[in-house]
Amino acid sequence: MSNKKIIFFTGGGTGGHVFPGISIIQKLKEFDNEIEFFWIGKKNSIEEKLIKEQDNIKFISIPCGKLRRYFSFKNFTDFFKVILGIIKSFYVLKKYKPQLIYATGGFVSTPAIIASSLLKIKSITHEMDLDPGLATKINSKFANNIHISFKESEKYFKNYKNIIYTGSPIRREFLNPDPKIIKQLTQNTNKPIISILGGSLGANALNNLALCIKKDAEIYFIHQSGKNLNDLSEKNYLRRQFFNAEEMASIVKFSNLIISRAGAGAIKEFANAGACAILIPFKKGSRGDQIKNAKLLTNQNACIYIDEDEILNINILKIIKKTLKDREKINSLKENIKKFNNKHSSTLIAKLLIKDIKETKSK
C-alpha cells in the first residue's frame, strides 16, 4: 500500500452525480490537504467538464456503456465497453493504489467499483435518489458500504448491513448565497422572480414551457436552458445555458418560485435553501426515479407536483400566480422541504472517509 493518501471518486452522466462528489472533496481538503484526488469518468462528458474546472482533481477517462433494464441492440456493444472499462479501471487503480473509491452514481461508476472489488480496495457507493438505480444495485453487490440520501431509501436495501444515511452533499457555494447576485441578474426588478431550471443537461419540456410563459409582464423569469438554446436577455426574461455555482445558489435561495425537474441533487439544494418549488419530474425514457422523488415530497406537502404529460393541458401561469398570492401555502412548502436537508452531509461523509483512510493505512 502506498504511503500517499489517495481517494478515487467515480460517477457522472449528469451534474447531479458530480456535484455531491465535488462537495465531499471540498470538505476533505479542509480536513486534510495532503489527500490526492482522482475522478474516473467518461471522456467528453459532463463529469469531465465539471471536474476539470476544479483545482487538484485529476480526471481519468474510461470506456463505459450504458446499463439498461430493457432490450436494445446497444446492450451488446455496451457490454464490451463495460468490460473494457473494468479492465482499464483495474490497471488505473492498481497503478495508483488508493485507499478508497467513492461512487456518486451513474453507469460510469460501475466498472471502477467492480475493479476495486477485484483489487480488495475499499469502496463506497452513494445513492442520491429515493430508490436505487441499476448502477447502484450492481455497485452495492461489490461495495463495502452504501450511503443513502433519503432515510426512506433504507427499505430498498433490506439485505445489506452497511447502510448509512448521510444525506446528499451540496456545493459549498449554496451554504451562503449572495442576494446581490440575483439582483444583478434580474436588473434589480421588483417583480416576483420565477426560475425555470432544466438541470445540467437542460430539459426540452421545461424549455418549451419557459418560451410559452416568458412574455407575462407581471413576472421576471430566469431560465437555465442547457446548450440547446442560446443565451438571451430581455426586459423581464434572462436565459442562460448555464449559471455558475454562485449564481445558481443565489437563484435557488432568492427566487419566489422555482420550476424544475425532480433530480435528487436539485431537491437537496432546494431543501437547503427552503425553496418553494414546482416539480415536473422527467418521465419519458426514465426509470421513474424523479417521479418517486417528487411524490415523496408531495406526500409531505413539500412541493407542488405537475405531471409532465399535463404541461400542455393546464394553465401553469394561473398556478404560479395563485401560489404567489397564497403566503400561507408558500411558507408551508418552504418549511416542509427543509425537512429533507441534512446540512452536515459533506462533513459527515468526509469524516467517515478520513476514518476509513486511517484504518486502511494502519493495516
Swiss-Prot record:
GO molecular function annotation: UDP-N-acetyl-D-glucosamine:N-acetylmuramoyl-L-alanyl-D-glutamyl-meso-2,6-diaminopimelyl-D-alanyl-D-alanine-diphosphoundecaprenol 4-beta-N-acetylglucosaminlytransferase activity; undecaprenyldiphospho-muramoylpentapeptide beta-N-acetylglucosaminyltransferase activity
The entry's keywords: Cell cycle, Cell division, Cell inner membrane, Cell membrane, Cell shape, Cell wall biogenesis/degradation, Glycosyltransferase, Membrane, Peptidoglycan synthesis, Transferase
GO cellular component, one term: plasma membrane
Pathway: Cell wall biogenesis; peptidoglycan biosynthesis
Organism this protein belongs to: Borreliella burgdorferi (strain ATCC 35210 / DSM 4680 / CIP 102532 / B31) (Borrelia burgdorferi)
Domain of life assignment: Bacteria
Topology term for the membrane: Peripheral membrane protein
Pfam families reported in the protein's UniProt record: Glyco_tran_28_C, Glyco_transf_28
Known function: Cell wall formation. Catalyzes the transfer of a GlcNAc subunit on undecaprenyl-pyrophosphoryl-MurNAc-pentapeptide (lipid intermediate I) to form undecaprenyl-pyrophosphoryl-MurNAc-(pentapeptide)GlcNAc (lipid intermediate II).
Primary location class: membrane
Residue numbers binding UDP-N-acetyl-alpha-D-glucosamine: 14-16, 171, 200, 290
CDD domains assigned to the protein according to its UniProt record, in alphabetical order: GT28_MurG (cd03785)
Reaction(s) this enzyme catalyzes, per UniProt: di-trans,octa-cis-undecaprenyl diphospho-N-acetyl-alpha-D-muramoyl-L-alanyl-D-glutamyl-meso-2,6-diaminopimeloyl-D-alanyl-D-alanine + UDP-N-acetyl-alpha-D-glucosamine = di-trans,octa-cis-undecaprenyl diphospho-[N-acetyl-alpha-D-glucosaminyl-(1->4)]-N-acetyl-alpha-D-muramoyl-L-alanyl-D-glutamyl-meso-2,6-diaminopimeloyl-D-alanyl-D-alanine + UDP + H(+)
Protein name: UDP-N-acetylglucosamine--N-acetylmuramyl-(pentapeptide) pyrophosphoryl-undecaprenol N-acetylglucosamine transferase
E.C. number: 2.4.1.227
Protein's cellular compartments: Cell inner membrane
GO-annotated biological processes: carbohydrate metabolic process; cell division; cell wall organization; lipid glycosylation; peptidoglycan biosynthetic process; regulation of cell shape
Family: Belongs to the glycosyltransferase 28 family. MurG subfamily.
Gene: murG
